[in-house]
């Protein structure tokens, strides 16, 4: 049994935020796939410490091309992060965040967006506080009709997790979101269940079977319907530079992805989605993504 002396701090166990509950299982389903898209991501960093991120994608079905540009500068001495964003919808965004300065574990963020074409403006203040066994969050969306308040809390103890998430619309004076979640996690196993607004029920299981193989199961059901959604996914690391991912759901949609690191900072991902119910009818999707980082 481990013991902790006066000069040896007990290891911290900070639970994830509510949005990150079940994230390990979702990542197996989502990462390594990009059906119907041709995508390019580029990340660079200047000598002065400014980070540049650009992303562009083309939808193979509609032909629509979208892109984003983001610049980020971290002033580590004061715990400040400045972020500027732009996208092809001509929406400009500015974000200022300060972390671990007012008190340890507290992060405050001021986020604004502006669309010159429509004149639409929005503002949001985000706050999060995380310490051992607790992770709290509170965001305020400012609107002319009245602000909306988003709150969340996750508590953890010896691997067990319990969370609550809500949204209060001050314009309507009522709760518009009321979610609960319970989970359990260890180093190679995670279980997550959730209830959204008393009508949507979901659960997921993540397990690291061995060093190279990760698996995930996802289940969802909405009350008042006979529709149950079920999926299985897996990721296998072929070697240090290549991995293959596969997933299938109860709608007979089969997805396969292959990721290869061509050289340090260059990663290629190929993916395909096949409709198992109509293999000969067409409608299948392919995807290609290239990530560059320097």
From Swiss-Prot:
PANTHER family documented for this protein: VOLTAGE-DEPENDENT ANION-SELECTIVE CHANNEL, VOLTAGE-DEPENDENT ANION-SELECTIVE CHANNEL PROTEIN 2
Catalyses which reaction(s): chloride(in) = chloride(out); K(+)(in) = K(+)(out); a 1,2-diacyl-sn-glycero-3-phospho-L-serine(in) = a 1,2-diacyl-sn-glycero-3-phospho-L-serine(out); a 1,2-diacyl-sn-glycero-3-phosphocholine(in) = a 1,2-diacyl-sn-glycero-3-phosphocholine(out)
N6-acetyllysine, modified sites: 31, 120, 277
Domain description: Consists mainly of a membrane-spanning beta-barrel formed by 19 beta-strands.
Cross-link Glycyl lysine isopeptide (Lys-Gly) (interchain with G-Cter in ubiquitin) mapped to chain: 31, 64, 120-121, 172, 277
Family: Belongs to the eukaryotic mitochondrial porin family.
Alphabetized UniProt keyword annotations: Acetylation, ATP-binding, Ion transport, Isopeptide bond, Lipid transport, Lipid-binding, Membrane, Mitochondrion, Mitochondrion outer membrane, NAD, Nucleotide-binding, Phosphoprotein, Porin, Transmembrane, Transmembrane beta strand, Transport, Ubl conjugation
GO cellular component, one term: mitochondrial outer membrane
Reported modifications of this chain: Ubiquitinated by PRKN during mitophagy, leading to its degradation and enhancement of mitophagy. Deubiquitinated by USP30.
One Gene Ontology term from the biological process aspect of the record: lipid transport
Binding sites annotated in the UniProt record for ATP: 23, 31
Chain positions with N6-succinyllysine modification: 31
Protein name as catalogued: Non-selective voltage-gated ion channel VDAC2
Sites of Phosphotyrosine modification: 78
Residue sites binding NAD(+) per the record: 253-255, 271-275
Modified residues (N-acetylalanine): 2
Statement: the UniProt record of this protein carries the keyword NAD: yes
Lineage: Eukaryota, Metazoa, Chordata, Craniata, Vertebrata
Species whose genome carries this gene: Bos taurus
